[in-house]
Every structure is written in structure tokens, then in C-alpha cells.
A protein has these predicted regions:
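Mixed-charge, Lys/Arg-rich low-complexity intrinsically disordered regions
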Residues: 1-3
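Generic structural signal for residues positioned in beta-strands
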Residues: 10, 38, 55, 69-71, ...
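C-terminal terminal-subdomain/extension
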Residues: 60-126
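Compact nucleic-acid interaction/catalytic patches
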Residues: 12, 17-63
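Loop/turn positions that initiate beta-strands
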Residues: 5-8
Length: 126
């Protein structure tokens, strides 16, 4: 699967206690002329201190097991080629795309969230 908007990936994000843990990440843009894309992670919703911009329910993606939220503060602009290389090496795993409605909520949240970095907002034209 090519690196493109709506693609969902499982990216290594383990902790000391769970080094093999992976979190769901969503690619939020197609590659631009420089081959860059915006990617954002999904994390477990633990309390009201979590970013409220886009809260997801377990039924919104097969990988989600419980209520989660989009971790806009860690949204990044990354090289699509580097991401593709990580997929080909098996470090990053591909999974089912996000449905169109959920993706639209995630993408709109990049501009709405007060936690999205300024450089990501500028890149997206927010």
C-alpha cells in the first residue's frame, strides 16, 4: 500500500515496560512535491485532560479496542519515502484505512486543536 491520505499504520511506540507496543497512526495528507506527509497518532483516552478535539470510539477502526483520542500534539511532517522504507522493513505495519467520515474529523482536528504544533498548522494552511 502506498503512503497516502487515510492510510492507517501501526508504529512502534513502546515504553520501557512494553517495548514492542505499537500505536495506530493516520496519514493525514498525500505526499507533497517534496515527498512529505502529515502523520498523527491515536492514544487511549484516559481522562478529561486528554485533547478533546477528536475523541474516537472503538467501532471507528478495527484496531481500536476502547475510547481513544487523536494525539495532535505529536502530529509530525515526515518523509513519505522514509515511512515507506519502514513499512517495507516490517518496522511499521499497515492496517485498514480509516473510513471517510472518521478521517474527515481527524483531519479537521489538526487545524482545530490547540495542541497541534504551529509548523504543522502552517504546513497544512490552517
Amino acid at each position: 500500500m502506498p503512503v497516502k491520505e487515510k492510510a492507517a499504520l501501526l508504529v512502534p511506540s513502546g515504553t520501557y515496560h512494553e517495548p514492542d507496543k505499537k500505536h495506530l497512526h493516520i496519514i493525514c495528507s498525500d505526499p507533497d512535491a517534496k515527498g512529505l506527509v502529515v502523520i498523527v497518532g491515536i492514544s487511549t483516552y484516559t481522562n478529561d485532560l486528554c485533547d478533546q478535539t477528536c475523541v474516537l470510539q472503538a467501532h471507528e477502526h478495527p484496531w481500536l479496542r476502547h475510547q481513544s483520542f487523536v494525539l495532535y500534539r505529536k502530529a509530525e511532517i515526515v518523509s513519505a519515502a522514509a515511512l515507506q522504507a519502514r513499512i517495507q522493513s516490517g518496522e511499521v505495519l499497515e492496517c485498514d484505512e480509516v473510513n471517510a467520515q472518521t478521517f474527515l474529523r481527524i483531519k479537521k482536528g489538526l487545524c482545530k486543536s490547540p495542541q497541534t504544533k504551529r509548523k504543522v498548522k502552517r504546513y497544512l494552511g490552517c
